[in-house]
Amino acid sequence: MEQTTLLRLAGAGLTALAGALALGPVVIPLMRRLRAGQTIRAEMSARHQAKAGTPTMGGVIFIIPAILATLIFAPRSGDALPRLIIALVLTVGHGLVGFADDYIKVVLKRSLGLRARDKLLAQVGLAAVLGYGAVEVLGLGTAVTLPVLNLTLELGRPLYYLLVLIMVWGTASAVNFADGLDGLLGGLSVITFSFYGLVVALALGQTDMAVLGTALVGGVLGFLHYNRHPARIFMGDVGSFALGGALAALAVLTKTEFLLVIVGAVYVIEVISVILQVLSFRLTGRRIFKMAPLHHHFELLGWSEGQVLRLFWGAGLLFTLLGWLVLPGMLAGR
């Protein structure tokens, strides 16, 4: 790794970390004054009921420093500038969608939040930016590589744009479902973005994407200081949606679309548990899990939050290591 690249990554990570640590004491009292407290579902465990009223919308604590750090330290020459713009549009755009959803729910006290139709329309627009930018602006093409098999498939524009839409919507939803315990999504995000920033992006020579990934890692680490158990603030949809948008952008812009299924397998499992729970109840009247997403099932089995965190973080690390093992084969096939 070149010294300049190392300095960029260190600068971005440390700047975002310091910024998040500095913003916490400002944002937490502000959210309390706005009465932006989290509501807790009635079927949750007694431990969760005690968290009712904890400030939410804390994602701004890491999003703002991470974006600023990226703008300061990311290179802008060649394809880096349009690639960076696309990734930041996906990150900030999803953050704004999540912010609107949070604001309507917790500040305006309208429990349904942003209408599903409006949320989907916004994500369709963001997916269009990502798909068009990747194919037409950056010329990345419409072929995808299947990990493990290392097969390259040419999808063509219509199918590829559909894939990007599914990735954007699915990744944001799956990451959002994983945000249910103190520190859970934060820890998983540190693992995932470390891999995409320090392994995938650097392997492809995309220093700009590496800076974005590292800045998000630094920002989330700073946020975890306030989100660790017992959490003083939750990231809310503003945080989880921004992370989901950034993750989808990194996967598409590095042309590792299907590798995300492996590296982000914990997110996939979480959303599948919700789908299975809903289908089972509608078709049979019975629930497969005590509660979905899956992390709540373990809680209701009597596991402590620490035990659930260790299981999910450990699984996230193992799936990321698996992704690391199959990455060279994918890159060799290009």
From Swiss-Prot:
CDD domains: GT_MraY. GO terms for biological process: cell division; cell wall organization; peptidoglycan biosynthetic process; regulation of cell shape. It is found in: Cell membrane. Keywords: Cell cycle, Cell division, Cell membrane, Cell shape, Cell wall biogenesis/degradation, Magnesium, Membrane, Metal-binding, Peptidoglycan synthesis, Transferase, Transmembrane, Transmembrane helix. It is a multi-pass membrane protein. One of its GO terms (molecular function) is phospho-N-acetylmuramoyl-pentapeptide-transferase activity. GO terms for cellular component: plasma membrane. Pathway: Cell wall biogenesis; peptidoglycan biosynthesis. Its main location: membrane. Its EC number is 2.7.8.13. It catalyses: UDP-N-acetyl-alpha-D-muramoyl-L-alanyl-gamma-D-glutamyl-meso-2,6-diaminopimeloyl-D-alanyl-D-alanine + di-trans,octa-cis-undecaprenyl phosphate = di-trans,octa-cis-undecaprenyl diphospho-N-acetyl-alpha-D-muramoyl-L-alanyl-D-glutamyl-meso-2,6-diaminopimeloyl-D-alanyl-D-alanine + UMP. Its cofactor is Mg(2+). The chain crosses the membrane at residues 11-31, 55-75, 84-104, 124-144, 158-178, 184-204, 205-225, 233-253, 258-278, 311-331. It is an enzyme of class 2 (transferase). Catalyzes the initial step of the lipid cycle reactions in the biosynthesis of the cell wall peptidoglycan: transfers peptidoglycan precursor phospho-MurNAc-pentapeptide from UDP-MurNAc-pentapeptide onto the lipid carrier undecaprenyl phosphate, yielding undecaprenyl-pyrophosphoryl-MurNAc-pentapeptide, known as lipid I. Belongs to the glycosyltransferase 4 family. MraY subfamily. This is Phospho-N-acetylmuramoyl-pentapeptide-transferase. The lineage of its organism: Bacteria, Bacillati, Bacillota, Clostridia, Eubacteriales. The gene is mraY.
